[in-house]
Amino acid sequence: VTSLTRKIGLSLGADTCWPICFEEILGDLAPVVKVGKDEVRFEVERVRIAPFALHAKVDYDLVIDRLTYWYAPAREWIKKSILMDGTYTWNNPWSIESNQKHTAYAAMLALGLPIPETWMVPPKSYEPKADLQVTLGRYADMFDLGEIGKQVGHPSFMKPYDGGGWVGVTKLDDEAGLRDAYEKSGKSLMHVQKGVIPFDRFVRCVGLGPQTILMNYDPSAPLHQRYRTDKDFVSAEQRKHIEDITLTINAFFGWDFNSCEALLKDGTWWPIDFANPCPDSQVTSLHYHFPWLVKAKLRWALFTAATKRKMRMNLDWAPFFEVRERKLGPERRIEEYGRLARAHFDTERFEEFCARELAQLDEVAWQYFGSERAREAIRKKVEQLFPKHEVESFNEHFFQAIQAWRADDKAARAPRLTQHVLAPVAAATGASKPKSPAKKR
């Protein structure tokens, strides 16, 4: 038996609470997993930002990346690490850089998904460039924005073609609103998209590897209340349908971690925002759902690092378009896309790995999220976002939301806990890590 260590790097920006929880639960769990004849242990550290030589060896087996979409030095370091050292990374940095929401809309339209009528309009103004005026003078057509609004239909939305976090999104009820939003859009390249209004249901599905969580979503609520906690808000068939859509998008673009917003109207699910490869991961918005995300990150991180999952640098779209050409009905076609996506994420092998090697994770995480360490991790994020006089009340609010999750989680796991005798697990106060020497492969 060979003892190996896999090293996980966290490439972080403003993320505060989930990295703390990730690190501390991993320390409590102290997993030693079997991969073939090898025993694999894990280390985790936060990636520093510094000058680097292109030939310098990177010793991370996995990097969980939260910076690529906006911070170029981290993105270019990750690209080099993948190319030269085979580092597995969430998410594919080339795909994040090149595939914006605009491409995602076009791709899913090409696969036959119901995407609302969407137009791109040239920006209202431009950054000065040497050939700009010549180009516009020769080739740019005048257009009637009001006529575009009529073709799209109202109500509609104007939003950046590459945006996120609801930044720059304007609801348009009429032509006057459309023209006003365009005048204020500045140099941003914008979409005008038909609104799916009124809708019967608004959901957000997060996919992390082959794992998904579907949440009822209220976009009109304050940020810390948008994710609702009700459970039976869609049928089993609808849940599977949305999960298939989410995993299809993720596999198609090579994103391990992404979210999909979809609206139900008159029996049809309309994906409206699904190029979010750095999804919200903070307790201050996810609250009750936050422990699921931390556990999902741990499972997929340990699996991808332990098994040395290979990074796919090139996207393989052909199998999806081959399904499209089979002229299946809409529901059957999305089922087939979902099957391809689950194969992409090696779902069967992942589930076997979790059942065999990470059986204690649920209990260790349950213990941790009831601890003072978890409360303190929450506090650190609350202190970043809320006025000083509101810190105590909101810290307690989010901690109690997680205690509600713990109550539900314990009840859900009760049948398993009575049927199987759990091996001793590390206490919530911490656990000593194995001290046997380990070598890196």
Predicted regions located by residue number:
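Glycine-rich phosphate/pyrophosphate-binding beta-alpha loops
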Residues: 68-69, 274-290
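ATP-grasp fold ATP-binding core
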Residues: 108-109, 116, 136-167, 187-198
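A long amphipathic alpha-helix within ATP-dependent nucleotide-binding catalytic cores
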Residues: 224-271, 295, 301, 305, ...
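Peripheral (often C-terminal) accessory segments that flank ATP-dependent C-N-forming ligase machineries
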Residues: 306-441
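Conserved N-proximal alpha/beta basic substrate-recognition cap immediately N-terminal to
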Residues: 12-135, 377-430
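Extreme N-terminal starter segment of soluble prokaryotic enzymes
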Residues: 3-9
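A short beta-strand motif that forms the metal-chelation/ATP-contact edge
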Residues: 60-64, 204-207, 268-281
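Phosphate-binding site of ATP-dependent enzymes
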Residues: 162-253
